[in-house]
Amino acid sequence: MARISRAAYAQMYGPTVGDKVRLADTELFIEVEKDLTIHGEEVKFGGGKVIRDGMGQSQVSRAQGAVDTVITNALVVDAGAGIFKADIGLKDGRIAAIGKAGNPDTQDGVTIIIGPGTEIIAGEGKILTAGGFDAHIHFICPQQIEEALMSGITTMLGGGTGPAHGTLATTCTPGPWHMARMIQSFDAFPMNIGLSGKGNASLPAALEEMVLGGACSLKLHEDWGTTPAAIDCCLSVADDYDVQVMIHTDTLNESGFVENTVAAIKGRTIHAFHTEGAGGGHAPDIIKVCGLPNVIPSSTNPTRPYTVNTLAEHLDMLMVCHHLSPSIPEDIAFAESRIRKETIAAEDILHDIGAFSIISSDSQAMGRVGEVAIRTWQTADKMKRQRGALPQETGDNDNFRVRRYIAKYTINPAIAHGLSKDIGSIAVGKRADLVLWNPAFFGVKPDMVLVGGMIAAAPMGDPNASIPTPQPMHYRPMFGAYGKARTNSSVTFVSKAALESGLHGRLGVEKQFVAVENTRGGIGKHSMVLNDATPHVEVDPETYEVRADGELLTCEPATVLPMAQRYFLF
């Protein structure tokens, strides 16, 4: 039998079982767990390569079963499915098959048929992940959407109407008129989008109006008054209409303390935004709710991870975002009450043990929309350096930790918001919202972003050059971002009630509406993939020290991070 060295094989076809790959410049190393391609029967495109007529390409038409696109020999990194090598077949904008691609007339073991109508994306030596989902968006400016797309985000959920002061501070789109205008604008963007309506009301009628107007979730924000009455009313409407509720609790403890908020929630499922508290919430102990079985806790990325710069930048951010004045002592006291190094340090560790389930951005409102992936992996790297390997690791690799952290911005927000039937993981039947990465740039700069099976964004060189690579090389929208390809490739997520009421026709939009589902009692902390820990968390009211199941949670701030200036010269 002919043999080939591992190095030569990896160079031609990408890594296989037992090979390890470093993620960017972090200390995180993944190991290939299985390989669904067949050694000696690999398919590869190019001059003198396999995918040619009568060789790796069959005579099968699309109607007879050939797929639209194959991503060849990709290294899949997925929270649920694991870390493995495979060919990925796409059809009708969804993942049609995961396995071995080729020509069944000439090759054994083919599960994905390549035909004359099949396009090829070379995944050799590349990492493939599900598109990211940022579930904490302030829609302050439309340019955020392109910024997020170019970082590997393919779904955004949040609220707002533009740079209005309500939107600068809160992720709420108030009322059906604003809801309609925002949804109509979404036809312009190659991004899956869902809106959160304002959830602050003590009577249900106005909230029901927003859910019927297209909101796929409701947001309770302290700047609108997150009182026990508003919490109870909002959750009751959410239960009636099967939409998620996100909460930003009462930092000033004016209408009650964390215990009063928990009592008002009454055990119902809720997504707690920036649960550490720097982004807002009962001071100093909102972090305690991350141990409750009905609370899905998340972080926003400015506190990710804890560094020597974290505290200093937060005070100014907070003053701007919440319309505070540095000349008013009470405003300064409000801001300072939210920024605590002890709880931010504990947040790092709570992520590492899987007690915090989601990471999002808080775009332009104390968060950076293009850095969800970067901040997630910087946190994972910091925790490995400070805490070593996780006890769940089964080999000399970081596979479990990597799967835990990628879940935080893919499958877990998708489950929390009722979108996991369509997005969040690499699985047959789900939307082909996919991101291809060069391992050296993993989490920082994608090689290619697909939305609904079509390439929507990629780095591209001078369009007038003789080849695609000459400078200036930068991210540009691709054909999936234009015309009706854009509206046929991405969707708008709404409530089932809005979908069934005929809202799509009344608004005259082109993008398909997809209803969220299973956001209430059927899910909770136990539903969070690899991030379902429920420790008993306590906060010392004097020192702000955080303990989980009696253990003090503390760590040093990072002075140097990976995925930073090495990748961004300008």
Swiss-Prot record:
Catalytic residues identified in the record: H322
Binding site for Ni(2+) 2: K219, H248, H274
Location in the cell: Cytoplasm
Chief place where the protein resides: cytoplasm
Record domain Urease: where: 131-570
Residue ranges the record marks as coiled coil: none
Sites bearing N6-carboxylysine, chain numbering: K219
Pfam families, sorted: Amidohydro_1 (PF01979), Urease_alpha (PF00449)
Residues bound to substrate: H221
EC numbers for this chain: 3.5.1.5
Catalytic activity: urea + 2 H2O + H(+) = hydrogencarbonate + 2 NH4(+)
Pathway(s): Nitrogen metabolism; urea degradation; CO(2) and NH(3) from urea (urease route): step 1/1
Top-level taxon of origin: Bacteria
GO cellular component, one term: cytoplasm
List of residues binding Ni(2+) 1: H136, H138, K219, D362
Protein name: Urease subunit alpha
Species the sequence originates in: Mesorhizobium japonicum (strain LMG 29417 / CECT 9101 / MAFF 303099) (Mesorhizobium loti (strain MAFF 303099))
Gene that specifies this protein: ureC
